[in-house]
Amino acid sequence: LRTLRLSETNITDEGISCLNGLGSLTVLDLSYTKVTDAGLKCLVRLKQLKQLDLASTAITDAGLTHIKKLTALQFLGLYATAETNAGLQKISRLKNLQFLGLYGTSVTDVGVNNLKKHLPGCTINR
């Protein structure tokens, strides 16, 4: 299994805990679900994950502590989450990141500009 789209389902942190055995997963869509920061801890084993969509979830800056370990990520959707400038610092080492969606967050131009210094090849949609 390489692609798993669980968008707009009732999946919770408990439900995604079983995903850590899916090591070949490259695309995971958890947008519009009940997933929180605590649930993201189990995703760190998904070393091949390239696309992760967390739009409209309860994810905060704290959740990016786990996301920063997904070094293969190329796409990260954080639309309409509680991310701030402080959280962006946590993902500044995701050197493979090509696209970051931040629309509807509290991130400012200052945060975006600081992140672009670390990830110049990343398109940031805000």
Question: Which stretches of residues belong to each language-model region?
Answer:
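Concave beta-strand-loop units of leucine-rich repeat
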Residues: 1-126
